[in-house]
Amino acid sequence: MSEAQYLKRFIFLETVAGVPGMIAGMIRHLRSLRTMQQDGGWIHHLLEEAENERVHLLTFLQLRQPGLLFRLAILGTQCIFVTGFSALYLLSSKTAHRFVGYLEEEAVKTYTNCIKELDEGNLPEWAKLDATKETIRYWGLPENAKWRDVLLAIRADEVMHREVNHHL
């Protein structure tokens, strides 16, 4: 895959990846209000996960701005996914988290393949690309960080999301 193809894939996937944490956090929040009981800190954690996925998206948007057709595809996908995931979460939160865990496993594989291609010299534009100030600040990267370092940080986030969702 080329840099442009990876960017399209990452942008599309990250627009969907932010949904589960937000839906799960909202449903758990409403349940906590309804039952008048603590949630054990999961609401905050799930909302942070959604925010982290949004940061991933914003990171990739620094390199490419999608066109109207792509944005419409995202809108349609989000409408379907929000509805479907909400229903699944209400029916079985355990199944919903397991599903997200598997999606995160696929994300880890995708980022791993991208990093491998970058290391093999198949993505020459990204090999010389510096990390942006925003990514350096967000992930605490060194000032001389490259795009590869950003991809490693994003992959590490996805690994954490995978583990948390398999735990839940």
Over which residues does each language-model region extend?
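Non-heme di-metal
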Residues: M1-L168
